[in-house]
Protein backbone atom coordinates (compact mmCIF):
# COMPACT_ATOMS: atom_id res chain seq x y z
CA UNK A 1 0.00 0.00 0.00
CA UNK A 2 2.84 2.41 0.83
CA UNK A 3 4.35 1.78 -2.59
CA UNK A 4 1.05 2.56 -4.29
CA UNK A 5 0.62 5.82 -2.35
CA UNK A 6 4.21 6.86 -3.07
CA UNK A 7 3.84 6.11 -6.78
CA UNK A 8 0.54 7.99 -6.89
CA UNK A 9 2.07 11.05 -5.23
CA UNK A 10 4.95 11.04 -7.70
CA UNK A 11 2.49 10.77 -10.60
CA UNK A 12 0.50 13.67 -9.16
CA UNK A 13 3.58 15.86 -8.77
CA UNK A 14 5.03 15.14 -12.21
CA UNK A 15 1.70 15.66 -13.98
CA UNK A 16 1.00 18.87 -12.04
CA UNK A 17 4.42 20.24 -13.02
CA UNK A 18 4.23 19.16 -16.66
CA UNK A 19 0.69 20.25 -17.51
CA UNK A 20 1.24 24.05 -17.40
CA UNK A 21 4.14 23.69 -19.84
CA UNK A 22 1.97 21.64 -22.20
CA UNK A 23 -0.80 24.25 -22.05
CA UNK A 24 1.68 27.07 -22.64
CA UNK A 25 3.23 25.25 -25.61
CA UNK A 26 -0.23 24.67 -27.05
CA UNK A 27 -1.05 28.37 -26.76
CA UNK A 28 2.30 29.59 -28.10
CA UNK A 29 1.93 27.45 -31.20
CA UNK A 30 -1.57 28.90 -31.64
CA UNK A 31 -3.00 25.46 -32.23
CA UNK A 32 -6.74 25.31 -32.82
CA UNK A 33 -8.46 24.02 -29.72
CA UNK A 34 -11.65 22.17 -28.88
CA UNK A 35 -14.75 22.86 -30.98
CA UNK A 36 -17.97 23.38 -28.99
CA UNK A 37 -21.52 22.18 -29.68
CA UNK A 38 -23.68 25.17 -30.59
CA UNK A 39 -26.83 23.70 -28.97
CA UNK A 40 -25.34 24.22 -25.51
CA UNK A 41 -24.73 27.96 -25.58
CA UNK A 42 -22.86 28.08 -22.27
CA UNK A 43 -20.15 25.98 -23.92
CA UNK A 44 -19.42 28.41 -26.75
CA UNK A 45 -17.05 30.43 -24.56
CA UNK A 46 -14.82 27.35 -24.33
CA UNK A 47 -14.07 27.27 -28.05
CA UNK A 48 -10.33 27.21 -28.60
CA UNK A 49 -9.53 25.69 -25.19
CA UNK A 50 -6.43 23.46 -25.50
CA UNK A 51 -7.11 19.75 -25.72
CA UNK A 52 -5.09 16.51 -25.84
CA UNK A 53 -4.18 16.91 -22.16
CA UNK A 54 -4.49 13.16 -21.90
CA UNK A 55 -1.14 12.95 -23.65
CA UNK A 56 0.56 14.27 -20.53
CA UNK A 57 -1.10 12.15 -17.85
CA UNK A 58 -0.88 9.01 -20.01
CA UNK A 59 2.85 9.44 -20.64
CA UNK A 60 3.46 10.11 -16.95
CA UNK A 61 1.30 7.22 -15.73
CA UNK A 62 2.55 4.59 -18.19
CA UNK A 63 6.22 5.57 -17.77
CA UNK A 64 6.05 5.46 -13.97
CA UNK A 65 4.10 2.20 -14.07
CA UNK A 66 6.74 0.50 -16.21
CA UNK A 67 9.55 1.74 -13.96
CA UNK A 68 7.88 0.68 -10.71
CA UNK A 69 6.84 -2.65 -12.22
CA UNK A 70 10.37 -3.47 -13.34
CA UNK A 71 11.78 -2.60 -9.93
CA UNK A 72 9.17 -4.12 -7.62
CA UNK A 73 7.29 -6.77 -9.65
CA UNK A 74 9.87 -8.89 -11.40
CA UNK A 75 7.94 -12.16 -11.59
CA UNK A 76 6.67 -13.08 -15.02
CA UNK A 77 3.00 -13.22 -14.08
CA UNK A 78 2.88 -9.71 -12.63
CA UNK A 79 4.95 -8.23 -15.44
CA UNK A 80 2.71 -9.92 -17.99
CA UNK A 81 -0.42 -8.56 -16.35
CA UNK A 82 0.97 -5.04 -15.99
CA UNK A 83 2.31 -5.08 -19.55
CA UNK A 84 -1.03 -6.24 -20.92
CA UNK A 85 -2.99 -3.46 -19.23
CA UNK A 86 -0.45 -0.75 -20.04
CA UNK A 87 -0.19 -1.87 -23.64
CA UNK A 88 -3.91 -1.56 -24.24
CA UNK A 89 -3.86 1.85 -22.53
CA UNK A 90 -1.08 2.97 -24.86
CA UNK A 91 -2.73 1.54 -27.97
CA UNK A 92 -6.04 3.23 -27.25
CA UNK A 93 -4.17 6.39 -26.32
CA UNK A 94 -2.48 6.33 -29.73
CA UNK A 95 -5.85 5.81 -31.44
CA UNK A 96 -7.21 8.82 -29.58
CA UNK A 97 -4.08 10.82 -30.37
CA UNK A 98 -4.50 10.13 -34.09
CA UNK A 99 -8.14 11.17 -33.89
CA UNK A 100 -7.29 14.42 -32.07
CA UNK A 101 -4.32 15.11 -34.35
CA UNK A 102 -6.44 14.88 -37.50
CA UNK A 103 -9.12 17.14 -36.04
CA UNK A 104 -6.77 19.82 -34.75
CA UNK A 105 -3.62 19.81 -36.85
CA UNK A 106 -5.00 18.57 -40.15
CA UNK A 107 -8.40 20.28 -39.77
CA UNK A 108 -10.27 17.04 -40.52
CA UNK A 109 -13.61 17.73 -38.81
CA UNK A 110 -14.42 14.17 -37.79
CA UNK A 111 -10.85 12.95 -37.23
CA UNK A 112 -10.65 9.23 -37.87
CA UNK A 113 -13.69 7.80 -39.62
CA UNK A 114 -15.94 5.55 -37.54
CA UNK A 115 -14.72 2.54 -39.52
CA UNK A 116 -11.05 3.43 -39.03
CA UNK A 117 -11.47 4.02 -35.31
CA UNK A 118 -13.47 0.82 -34.78
CA UNK A 119 -10.92 -1.24 -36.70
CA UNK A 120 -8.04 0.12 -34.64
CA UNK A 121 -9.97 -0.45 -31.42
CA UNK A 122 -10.60 -4.08 -32.39
CA UNK A 123 -6.88 -4.52 -33.08
CA UNK A 124 -6.08 -3.06 -29.65
CA UNK A 125 -8.53 -5.43 -28.00
CA UNK A 126 -6.99 -8.39 -29.84
CA UNK A 127 -3.53 -7.43 -28.61
CA UNK A 128 -4.78 -7.38 -25.01
CA UNK A 129 -6.48 -10.74 -25.50
CA UNK A 130 -3.35 -12.36 -26.93
CA UNK A 131 -0.95 -10.89 -24.36
CA UNK A 132 -3.02 -11.23 -21.19
CA UNK A 133 -6.16 -13.35 -21.63
CA UNK A 134 -4.83 -16.26 -23.68
CA UNK A 135 -1.77 -16.98 -21.47
CA UNK A 136 -3.98 -16.90 -18.37
CA UNK A 137 -6.41 -19.39 -19.86
CA UNK A 138 -9.43 -17.26 -18.89
CA UNK A 139 -12.58 -18.08 -20.86
CA UNK A 140 -15.33 -17.39 -18.32
CA UNK A 141 -17.21 -14.39 -16.96
CA UNK A 142 -17.42 -14.30 -13.17
CA UNK A 143 -20.88 -13.27 -11.96
CA UNK A 144 -21.37 -13.45 -8.18
CA UNK A 145 -18.95 -16.35 -7.97
CA UNK A 146 -20.55 -18.31 -10.80
CA UNK A 147 -18.32 -18.72 -13.84
CA UNK A 148 -20.02 -18.62 -17.23
CA UNK A 149 -17.62 -20.44 -19.54
CA UNK A 150 -17.79 -18.97 -23.02
CA UNK A 151 -14.87 -20.68 -24.72
CA UNK A 152 -13.95 -18.87 -27.93
CA UNK A 153 -16.85 -16.46 -27.42
CA UNK A 154 -14.91 -14.93 -24.54
CA UNK A 155 -12.77 -13.24 -27.19
CA UNK A 156 -15.91 -11.57 -28.54
CA UNK A 157 -16.80 -10.48 -25.01
CA UNK A 158 -13.34 -8.97 -24.41
CA UNK A 159 -13.52 -7.00 -27.66
CA UNK A 160 -17.06 -5.81 -26.90
CA UNK A 161 -16.08 -4.83 -23.34
CA UNK A 162 -12.93 -2.92 -24.22
CA UNK A 163 -14.28 -1.16 -27.31
CA UNK A 164 -17.61 -0.42 -25.65
CA UNK A 165 -16.25 1.15 -22.49
CA UNK A 166 -13.52 3.09 -24.28
CA UNK A 167 -16.23 4.76 -26.36
CA UNK A 168 -18.47 5.16 -23.30
CA UNK A 169 -15.85 7.15 -21.37
CA UNK A 170 -15.22 9.14 -24.54
CA UNK A 171 -18.91 10.14 -24.60
CA UNK A 172 -18.75 11.05 -20.91
CA UNK A 173 -15.93 13.53 -21.53
CA UNK A 174 -18.24 16.37 -22.50
CA UNK A 175 -18.11 18.90 -19.66
CA UNK A 176 -15.34 20.18 -17.41
CA UNK A 177 -14.05 17.59 -14.97
CA UNK A 178 -16.81 15.02 -15.49
CA UNK A 179 -14.80 12.19 -17.04
CA UNK A 180 -11.62 12.71 -15.02
CA UNK A 181 -13.30 12.53 -11.60
CA UNK A 182 -15.73 9.80 -12.69
CA UNK A 183 -12.79 7.63 -13.73
CA UNK A 184 -10.97 8.39 -10.46
CA UNK A 185 -14.03 7.15 -8.54
CA UNK A 186 -14.18 3.99 -10.66
CA UNK A 187 -10.46 3.34 -10.26
CA UNK A 188 -10.64 3.78 -6.49
CA UNK A 189 -13.39 1.17 -6.36
CA UNK A 190 -11.22 -1.23 -8.35
CA UNK A 191 -8.33 -0.33 -6.07
CA UNK A 192 -10.31 -1.69 -3.12
CA UNK A 193 -11.10 -4.87 -5.07
CA UNK A 194 -7.46 -5.29 -6.13
CA UNK A 195 -6.29 -4.80 -2.54
CA UNK A 196 -8.83 -7.33 -1.24
CA UNK A 197 -7.62 -9.85 -3.83
CA UNK A 198 -3.96 -9.21 -3.08
CA UNK A 199 -3.44 -7.96 -6.64
CA UNK A 200 -0.87 -5.34 -5.68
CA UNK A 201 0.45 -5.12 -9.24
CA UNK A 202 -2.94 -3.90 -10.46
CA UNK A 203 -3.26 -1.70 -7.36
CA UNK A 204 0.00 0.01 -8.31
CA UNK A 205 -1.29 0.87 -11.79
CA UNK A 206 -4.50 2.21 -10.29
CA UNK A 207 -2.67 4.36 -7.73
CA UNK A 208 -0.43 5.91 -10.38
CA UNK A 209 -3.30 6.71 -12.74
CA UNK A 210 -5.39 8.16 -9.91
CA UNK A 211 -2.50 10.45 -8.94
CA UNK A 212 -2.02 11.60 -12.54
CA UNK A 213 -5.76 12.20 -13.04
CA UNK A 214 -6.12 14.20 -9.83
CA UNK A 215 -3.30 16.46 -11.01
CA UNK A 216 -4.98 16.79 -14.40
CA UNK A 217 -8.22 17.78 -12.67
CA UNK A 218 -6.46 20.86 -11.26
CA UNK A 219 -6.47 22.18 -14.83
CA UNK A 220 -9.65 20.46 -16.07
CA UNK A 221 -12.24 21.62 -13.52
CA UNK A 222 -14.56 24.46 -14.51
CA UNK A 223 -13.44 26.69 -16.10
CA UNK A 224 -11.19 24.16 -17.78
CA UNK A 225 -7.77 25.29 -18.95
CA UNK A 226 -7.40 22.08 -20.96
CA UNK A 227 -9.43 19.03 -22.02
CA UNK A 228 -8.13 15.45 -22.06
CA UNK A 229 -9.21 14.79 -25.65
CA UNK A 230 -9.81 11.38 -27.21
CA UNK A 231 -6.22 10.47 -26.38
CA UNK A 232 -7.19 10.45 -22.71
CA UNK A 233 -10.80 9.28 -22.72
CA UNK A 234 -10.37 6.29 -25.04
CA UNK A 235 -7.35 5.08 -23.06
CA UNK A 236 -9.10 5.45 -19.70
CA UNK A 237 -12.15 3.53 -20.86
CA UNK A 238 -9.97 0.72 -22.17
CA UNK A 239 -8.05 0.67 -18.88
CA UNK A 240 -11.22 0.27 -16.82
CA UNK A 241 -12.40 -2.59 -19.02
CA UNK A 242 -8.99 -4.30 -18.87
CA UNK A 243 -8.81 -3.97 -15.08
CA UNK A 244 -12.30 -5.44 -14.61
CA UNK A 245 -11.20 -8.42 -16.73
CA UNK A 246 -7.85 -8.78 -14.96
CA UNK A 247 -9.58 -8.82 -11.55
CA UNK A 248 -12.19 -11.32 -12.81
CA UNK A 249 -14.97 -8.93 -11.81
CA UNK A 250 -16.27 -8.00 -15.25
CA UNK A 251 -19.90 -7.50 -14.20
CA UNK A 252 -18.95 -4.84 -11.69
CA UNK A 253 -18.08 -2.36 -14.42
CA UNK A 254 -21.75 -2.16 -15.42
CA UNK A 255 -22.47 -0.75 -11.95
CA UNK A 256 -19.20 0.99 -11.05
CA UNK A 257 -19.30 2.50 -14.53
CA UNK A 258 -22.99 3.44 -14.32
CA UNK A 259 -22.22 6.98 -15.52
CA UNK A 260 -20.60 5.71 -18.73
CA UNK A 261 -23.40 3.19 -19.26
CA UNK A 262 -26.00 5.92 -18.79
CA UNK A 263 -24.24 8.30 -21.18
CA UNK A 264 -23.93 5.65 -23.89
CA UNK A 265 -27.45 4.29 -23.42
CA UNK A 266 -28.90 7.79 -23.78
CA UNK A 267 -27.22 8.20 -27.17
CA UNK A 268 -28.34 4.77 -28.39
CA UNK A 269 -31.93 5.29 -27.22
CA UNK A 270 -32.09 8.77 -28.73
CA UNK A 271 -30.85 7.66 -32.14
CA UNK A 272 -33.06 4.56 -32.22
CA UNK A 273 -36.21 6.41 -31.12
CA UNK A 274 -35.57 9.30 -33.51
CA UNK A 275 -35.23 6.95 -36.49
CA UNK A 276 -38.28 4.93 -35.45
CA UNK A 277 -40.55 7.96 -35.02
CA UNK A 278 -39.30 9.54 -38.22
CA UNK A 279 -40.22 6.40 -40.13
CA UNK A 280 -43.60 6.02 -38.39
CA UNK A 281 -44.73 9.63 -38.05
CA UNK A 282 -42.69 11.39 -40.70
CA UNK A 283 -40.75 13.40 -38.15
CA UNK A 284 -38.11 12.39 -35.66
CA UNK A 285 -38.91 12.70 -31.96
CA UNK A 286 -36.58 12.74 -28.99
CA UNK A 287 -36.53 11.12 -25.57
CA UNK A 288 -33.83 13.42 -24.19
CA UNK A 289 -33.39 17.13 -24.77
CA UNK A 290 -29.87 16.39 -25.98
CA UNK A 291 -27.40 13.53 -25.67
CA UNK A 292 -25.14 12.35 -24.13
CA UNK A 293 -27.08 12.47 -20.86
CA UNK A 294 -24.99 15.22 -19.24
CA UNK A 295 -26.25 17.64 -21.91
CA UNK A 296 -29.84 16.59 -21.12
CA UNK A 297 -29.22 17.64 -17.51
CA UNK A 298 -27.59 20.91 -18.56
CA UNK A 299 -30.64 21.88 -20.59
CA UNK A 300 -33.19 21.44 -17.81
CA UNK A 301 -32.23 19.02 -15.07
CA UNK A 302 -34.00 15.72 -14.49
CA UNK A 303 -37.57 16.96 -14.90
CA UNK A 304 -37.10 19.53 -17.63
CA UNK A 305 -39.12 22.02 -15.56
CA UNK A 306 -36.10 23.19 -13.60
CA UNK A 307 -33.74 25.92 -14.68
CA UNK A 308 -30.73 24.84 -16.67
CA UNK A 309 -28.21 23.04 -14.52
CA UNK A 310 -24.73 24.48 -14.19
CA UNK A 311 -21.79 22.27 -15.10
CA UNK A 312 -20.86 21.99 -11.43
CA UNK A 313 -24.35 20.72 -10.61
CA UNK A 314 -24.26 18.17 -13.44
CA UNK A 315 -20.79 17.08 -12.35
CA UNK A 316 -21.82 16.73 -8.71
CA UNK A 317 -24.93 14.71 -9.60
CA UNK A 318 -23.09 12.26 -11.86
CA UNK A 319 -20.06 11.97 -9.56
CA UNK A 320 -22.41 11.17 -6.67
CA UNK A 321 -24.19 8.59 -8.83
CA UNK A 322 -20.88 6.93 -9.67
CA UNK A 323 -19.77 6.99 -6.04
CA UNK A 324 -23.00 5.45 -4.73
CA UNK A 325 -22.90 2.77 -7.43
CA UNK A 326 -19.29 1.93 -6.55
CA UNK A 327 -20.13 1.67 -2.84
CA UNK A 328 -23.03 -0.66 -3.66
CA UNK A 329 -20.68 -2.98 -5.57
CA UNK A 330 -18.15 -3.01 -2.73
CA UNK A 331 -20.94 -3.70 -0.23
CA UNK A 332 -22.17 -6.63 -2.32
CA UNK A 333 -18.68 -8.08 -2.60
CA UNK A 334 -17.38 -7.60 0.92
CA UNK A 335 -20.23 -7.09 3.41
Swiss-Prot record:
Native source organism of the sequence: Streptococcus equi subsp. zooepidemicus (strain MGCS10565)
Transmembrane domains' residue ranges: 3-23, 53-73, 78-98, 118-138, 143-163, 174-194, 200-220, 226-246, 251-271, 314-334
Protein function: Catalyzes the initial step of the lipid cycle reactions in the biosynthesis of the cell wall peptidoglycan: transfers peptidoglycan precursor phospho-MurNAc-pentapeptide from UDP-MurNAc-pentapeptide onto the lipid carrier undecaprenyl phosphate, yielding undecaprenyl-pyrophosphoryl-MurNAc-pentapeptide, known as lipid I.
GO molecular function, a single term: phospho-N-acetylmuramoyl-pentapeptide-transferase activity
PROSITE patterns: MRAY_2
Name of the protein described by the UniProt record: Phospho-N-acetylmuramoyl-pentapeptide-transferase
A Pfam family of this chain: Glycos_transf_4
Keyword check for Calcium: no
Pathway terms, separated by semicolons: Cell wall biogenesis; peptidoglycan biosynthesis
Record-listed E.C. numbers: 2.7.8.13
Membership in a protein family: Belongs to the glycosyltransferase 4 family. MraY subfamily.
PANTHER family: PHOSPHO-N-ACETYLMURAMOYL-PENTAPEPTIDE-TRANSFERASE, PHOSPHO-N-ACETYLMURAMOYL-PENTAPEPTIDE-TRANSFERASE HOMOLOG
Catalytic activity: UDP-N-acetyl-alpha-D-muramoyl-L-alanyl-gamma-D-glutamyl-L-lysyl-D-alanyl-D-alanine + di-trans,octa-cis-undecaprenyl phosphate = Mur2Ac(oyl-L-Ala-gamma-D-Glu-L-Lys-D-Ala-D-Ala)-di-trans,octa-cis-undecaprenyl diphosphate + UMP
Gene Ontology terms describing biological process: cell division; cell wall organization; peptidoglycan biosynthetic process; regulation of cell shape
Bilayer topology annotation: Multi-pass membrane protein
Compartment annotation: Cell membrane
InterPro entries in the record: Glycosyl_transferase_4, PNAcMuramoyl-5peptid_Trfase, PNAcMuramoyl-5peptid_Trfase_CS
UniProt keywords, alphabetically: Cell cycle, Cell division, Cell membrane, Cell shape, Cell wall biogenesis/degradation, Magnesium, Membrane, Metal-binding, Peptidoglycan synthesis, Transferase, Transmembrane, Transmembrane helix
Cofactor: Mg(2+)
UniProt keyword annotation of tRNA-binding present: no
